[in-house]
Amino acid sequence: MRKEIEKLLQSVQKPARYAGGELNSVMKDKSKVTLRYAFCFPDTYEIGMSHLGMKILYGVANAREDTWCERVFAPADDMEALMRANGEPLFALESGDPIKDFDMIGFTMQYELSYTNILNMLDLAGVPLRAEDRKSLTPIVAFGGPCACNPEPVAEFADIIFLGEGEETTNTVLDLLKACKESGKSKQEFLEAAMHIQGIYVPSFYEDSYNPDGTLCALTPTHGAPATVKKSIVSDMNKCYYPDSFVVPFIDIVHDRAVEEIFRGCIRGCRFCQAGFIYRPIREKSVETINRQSKALIDSTGYDELSLCSLSTSDHSCVNEMLTSLIDWTVRDKINLSLPSLRVDNFSDELVDKLSKVRRSGLTFAPEAGTQRMRDVINKNVTEEEVLRTCTKAFAGGWTSVKLYFMMGLPTETMEDIAGIAQLAGKVVDAYYNTPEHKKGCAVSVSVSCASFIPKPFTPFQWEPEDTMTSLRAKQAHLLESVPSRKIRVSYHETPTSLLEGVLARGDRRLSKVLLRAFELGCKFDSWDDHFNFDALMQAFEECGLDPDFYTKRRRPFEELLPWDHLDYGVSRKFLELENKRAHQNVTTPHCRIRCAGCGANKLNGGHCDARPEVARDTTAVQ
């Protein structure tokens, strides 16, 4: 670490955020590598170090002898103030070197409210914010992550954008950048070659135009760019790179544990869930792979907790065999095994028995809506009876606390649906005391977490209006009034942040200037309540001549061109339209293992997809 940085660390809170040198961090001789890659997480160290994707791609890049990948996080206010006052640019943790001198600077876009942090970090690094102002080959500024499925609001700031999964595309891009650097190619030549890589989008090669009513007229390809850009996908999770060690922090982070990803994708088709569609098709790891990788992580990190990661852990086709294998050694070695993302409808007696053998923590389930009508609208395919039966099994197995996830602001929602959330939670409390085997002398705790629904791209609800702040606040008040028991604790999201998230989630390229102006007005850490500056954001919209209501309050007609329609994430637009119509008729769609819904993800040729050449269900009923 440079002495200039050491001096600054004497005056900040949590200096370990910036010191580097943790167990399993990668150090290389920079004179012996060709490429230097700064992997940036646009939030604080504690949040970024918890992110699995960063751990994976950090390992992918550092497995190359020609590349040194280093980590970068958004400095907290105290550190940033000192850095700016002392002219110290943003630096990488491993070397302490300024990232403006690196060959590639990559940002992961995990949530829309981090976009102003990306601009702040580029500015702190001394890197021009707009792609058109960066003339030299390096540094290439790359974005990726789940929010890249609609990158248009940040399109003016990125040279390239990774679509889909990055394990294989990262190496392809680094190979190209190395070749261009060694042969003296220009940035333009690099971009013209990169646009032919599956999963790479070059936004500067697409020109946007708008209709008189403000809707998108066209995104016209230039420079020979493809009309449609297809996401990258890992076809075989057993052969895909996965780290055998994680960097172990010196300080507590949000999720400080070993994490084993057991599969990608989801069979369920919940209509509000973006991840359930953009990560299709489902691709599982074998039990042998899961067991081997989990043991390696525990051995290399010293963690005493292992968390299994997926969109729905209990949907793994070999979940019981997997748990038996893991429990054999985690119980022996006193390792806590954590299973988030459990489904209400497959919480079996066998699963309860296996979970009872590991260290007990609270269970989390997601009914998502309080009434059956609303659950049918969102295609949750879970009944109240299944929720209560599952909670009863848990209580009989010795659990005393349950967390229930819900959403409010869903399409067609009424106050009756909101009251249904409280009523269902009350029935869960009753189920505890009506269970003869419940833990005597212990009170039940039911936590209700209620998120504000935000329509997202590549979901059946991408055309729907977002609920207004006034309506959401009324629903939050009604929920609190409807709670029947003190055993129930309710939490919900602040509505102004939901408004901004909704605008950016489905926004177009014109929002780049709004983000730039918001950053100039001091906006950053927009997901943090103590930093969120609603007035400054509204000022930015006004000065740029754009109305946030245009992006949130109106229902988009099916024929409208959407800002992400030129991107191909596998699931077809026709299928999403059909699912939207079914939602408005309260018609559910069975999950993939019951019957193929013809979503189109089988064309990606990866993983296991039950799709057949023909669409396996009658689609005329909702035309």
Go through each PLM region and give its residues.
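Radical SAM enzyme core and accessory elements
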Residues: 1-31, 37-39, 484-623
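N-terminal [4Fe-4S]-dependent radical SAM core
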Residues: 6-38, 45-46, 203, 209-259, ...
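N-terminal pre-triad scaffold of radical SAM enzymes
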Residues: 37-43, 61, 247-274, 298, ...
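Conserved SAM/AdoMet-binding glycine-rich loop
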Residues: 40, 296-403, 408-447, 455
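Canonical Radical SAM [4Fe-4S] cluster-binding loop centered on the CxxxCxxC motif
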Residues: 51, 252-288, 598-615
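A short beta-strand-loop structural module common to alpha/beta enzyme folds
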Residues: 66-78
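Glycine-rich beta-alpha loop elements in corrinoid/cobalamin-binding modules
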Residues: 75-220, 457-508, 516-531
